[in-house]
Amino acid sequence: MTFSHHHAPARRDVDMTQGSITRHLIQFALPLLAGNVFQQLYNMVDTWVVGNFVSNEAFSAVGTVGPIINMLIGFFMGLSSGAGVVISQYYGAHRPEKVRDTVHTAMVLTLVLCAVFTALGLALIPAMLDLMNTPAEVLPESTAYLSIYFSGITGLLIYNMGSGILRAVGDSRRPFYFLVVSAVLNTGLDLLFVIRFHMGVAGVAWATIIAQAVSAVLVLAVLMRTDSCVRVELRRLRVHWDMLKKIVRVGIPAALQMAVTAFSNVFVQSYINHFGADCMSGWTAYTKIDQLMFLPMQSLALSATTFVGQNLGAGDTPRAQQGVRRALGISLAVTAVLMVPVLLFAPQLTAFFNRKAEVVAYGTLLLRYISPFYLLCCINQIYSGALRGAGNSQVPMVIMLGSFVVFRQIYLYIMSHYITNTLLPLAMGYPAGWLVCSAATLLYYRRAALGRQRLVEDN
């Protein structure tokens, strides 16, 4: 990597087609992991500020809109990954002119989506809240929050797409720096708007979109000043239809998969709610730890996506496959190491979120029964990440939706209606879904030759 001093901004892109596989995977995954942990932390700060300085209704309101926002973020991340895969393959193939076309097409697509989602989002707020059975006392707060959020959604889209472009050429560091700036700013504005100016839920929403706007501006500044092939120039902004087709082919299935997976947890939640408030709180504590357990494998799955993309683009299938095996090995090892303290200290971890004895009992039960199954998740995360890097996101989408949504819903329905309405069999809906998903993904990955799936046409 070359660093230049004053004149041109340094190139931070990383060519993953040469050099140590393990080092590439880990160096790429670490900023992603740190960024994700940071995001979880500032979500927690958001929740803490609202829970302690605004009303109980406000706390529920922010909780209610959570799934809607996660679904949106999932959708954009999937779409950005589509552009990222196309870019990483052309980058690996050393076709800078194609990279340039893809980048500009992706930016035009993003700007169009900004307009569409702002308008649609604002128009559909009542319908969305109605669909989620939002309690009447929470409606005004939820509506206010979403109205502000959708008005400023442009920042979120631009940041996501811009980060996706940078990651495709191996730069996961700068998106991380921008995330940190955004998180710190968000926290500061939260405290200022909510505690100092007493703006309530609206203050939290404003803090979020201002912070996102700043990260979008930072990403754009880098893309417009970089001297690598992903440089964005206003005069080149136009749609290259052949590139758009490729972005959509990978991006839409990935977007649907991420959006629906984010939303399918809402259905599980409704089954958990039957067991009363203590169980709900125990489940909430469990999900917080669950999210942290998932981060290492998710970061490595993204590493695998970029790694496979670049190496297939370069025509080096064996190296791509070796990278996938290595990523799986690392993620299994890291997850196994993380599982030990979770199993040992489950009561203390739950008590960190809620000290009530019944809540701790529920949280401990869930953590101890479900966490050994995280090893299964490594399999489906890494392999579907690898397949997506190869440009095949349709099959992983079908497998994931089949096992996380269809299978899990049928399982929960049959369990709760015909067998037993006790907590553990229902909570096992998660591992059962993971088992089906991992088995199917593994079988498919074994049969599908990675190399046949390149998006890059030979010269």
Where are these regions (language model features)?
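Short alpha-helical transmembrane segments in multi-pass integral membrane proteins
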Residues: 1-29, 87-152, 196-252, 308-373, ...
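Short runs within selected transmembrane alpha-helices of multi-pass transporters and secretion channels
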Residues: 80, 148-167, 175-183, 204-219, ...
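Helix-terminus/linker motif at the lipid-water interface of multi-pass membrane proteins
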Residues: 37, 41-59, 129-136, 192-199, ...
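Transmembrane alpha-helix boundary and packing residues in multipass membrane permease domains
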Residues: 32, 36, 48, 85, ...
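Small-residue hotspots at the loop-to-helix junctions and early N-terminal turns
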Residues: 54-67, 142-146, 205, 277-292, ...
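Transmembrane helical elements of multi-pass membrane transporters/channels
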Residues: 27-46, 148, 159, 182, ...
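N-terminal transmembrane alpha-helices
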Residues: 16-53, 67-82, 86, 111-118, ...
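Small-residue-rich hydrophobic transmembrane alpha-helices
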Residues: 59-119, 156-175, 269, 282-346, ...
